[in-house]
Amino acid sequence: MDLIIKEKRDNPILKRKEIKYVLKFDSSRTPSREEIKELIAKHEGVDKELVIVDNNKQLTGKHEIEGYTKIYADKPSAMLYEPDYELIRNGLKQKEAK
């Protein structure tokens, strides 16, 4: 997989970095959210627990994903600013049974 950073912005008020990227991949299947999270964490040199994969858009007819990710300075900041559904999707919170 080839990660291309299109835009990187520091957001000190929310204690996070915001990254827009293009991910090119060779396999016949689209990479999972967890695989993307690990790749970005490795690329940025942070713990994968601090990476929130917010948005992924598969480009039709191409082996590419355009995405938006947030990297928090610490876990409490992520828990404070992210909505519950994003925390559940990214494995930072467990879904409550009804």
From Swiss-Prot:
InterPro entries: Nucleotide-bd_a/b_plait_sf (IPR012677), Ribosomal_eS24 (IPR001976), Ribosomal_eS24_CS (IPR018098), Ribosomal_uL23/eL15/eS24_sf (IPR012678)
Transmembrane region(s): none
Keywords from the UniProt entry: Ribonucleoprotein, Ribosomal protein
Top-level taxon: Archaea
Entry's Gene Ontology BP terms: translation
Molecular-function GO term, any one: structural constituent of ribosome
GO CC annotation, single: ribonucleoprotein complex
Gene3D superfamilies according to UniProt: 3.30.70.330
Family label: Belongs to the eukaryotic ribosomal protein eS24 family.
Protein name: Small ribosomal subunit protein eS24
Species, as recorded: Thermoplasma acidophilum (strain ATCC 25905 / DSM 1728 / JCM 9062 / NBRC 15155 / AMRC-C165)
